[in-house]
Swiss-Prot record:
It comes from the Eukaryota. The gene is Fancd2os. This is FANCD2 opposite strand protein. It comes from Mus musculus.
Amino acid sequence: MAGYQLWSPWTPLDESFQWLRHTTPTPSSKHPFRASPCFPHTPSDLEVQLCLQEVTLVLDRPLVEPGESPKLPCHKSELRAVSNKKGVVRKPQPVRLSGVDSVFGRVITAQPPKWTGTFRVSDKSAFCKIISREHQWPTGLKEPQVQMTVTMCKQMLRSILLLYATYKKCTFALQHSK
């Protein structure tokens, strides 16, 4: 079930990297009432479990076989019907850019341009739309611009901290409300 919860069913690291490591997340013991006999599953939990029993998770072949070009995992040819009455859900596969890859229908370099005093961008680089050769780069920032940039960064950090503090207070209030 996809959605936000006040406590996660597994650790945040597992939640972030479970698809990459091809492992099943282990239940977390963060919540004191989880899996307790005093608190049985709600009817909605049972309904979700019944819905998920009708779906089959198929772990497929590797993303790219030797001699093939990489395709997006959600391509129409990847969706196949199954002869029995169960549906098929394909696990999304990570796409790794290494060296040269095909993105948006044309060959690009996967590495960003390196800073060597000026940006040097080839025509086939993914950054050619962001950085043009005709663009004139400033030679340096003036002191007032530096001060204004530092002030803006401090204000943004303060805003982020205030938002985070508000989020933590709301989460605490929701967890301890009746």
